[in-house]
Amino acid sequence: MKIPSEFDPIRPFEPEELPAVYDRILADKQFQMVLAYLYPDVPVEAIAKKMHACKTNLEFQKTFCYPFLQRLVTELSLGCSMDAVNIDTRKRYTFVSNHRDIVLDSAFLDKLLMDVGFATTCEIAIGDNLLSQDWVRDLVRINKSFTVERALHSVEMLRASKRMSEYIHFAIAEKND
């Protein structure tokens, strides 16, 4: 699907962009330190190979995010579930949550959507104020997040809000991912 170019600065990465983004984050020293912490016995080269094998955002989520979240549930909680008996997994939905933990709450929602049989995960709005590192900005866009531009003056903020609103409408009405 061709996404209008005006959304390029805020939209999630598309599959054809992923290889270059993987290379960029894998070259980042701070990201390498995070990988060494999360995967102490796995060489960065092996992680890079596994990452490059992920041809879509969803494959990346299933390969890296889902196992990490499952480990959190298993080791640090009594469980995490979703009653989806009245939800048609073939339809699209808009989920709205509070501002408690933007990254973790939405990550668990993605995990639960996979658990109950949705073919894809959600796109997540995240403020640019939380994306101070380039590798973090890239990682959330791999993970299907779109950026809410916050650090703007009033006229710019109005334009950015309009663009974000148009992107959300586009994502709901036209994207099937």
Question: Which residues fall in each region the model found?
Answer:
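Membrane-anchoring hydrophobic helices of lipid-metabolizing enzymes
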Residues: 1-93, 99-110, 114, 121, ...
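Charge-dense, low-complexity intrinsically disordered segments
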Residues: 55, 59, 151, 155-158
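Acidic/His-rich structured neighborhood in mature extracellular/periplasmic domains
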Residues: 150, 160-161, 165
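Conserved Motif II region of HX4D acyltransferases
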Residues: 90-97, 165-177
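Short beta-strand->loop
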Residues: 97, 125-128, 150
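Glycine-/small-residue-rich active-site loops that bind phosphorylated ligands and cofactors
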Residues: 100-102, 131-132, 153-156
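Carboxylate/His-rich catalytic cores and anion/metal-binding grooves
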Residues: 110, 119-132
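Eukaryotic endomembrane system proteins
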Residues: 141-147, 173-177
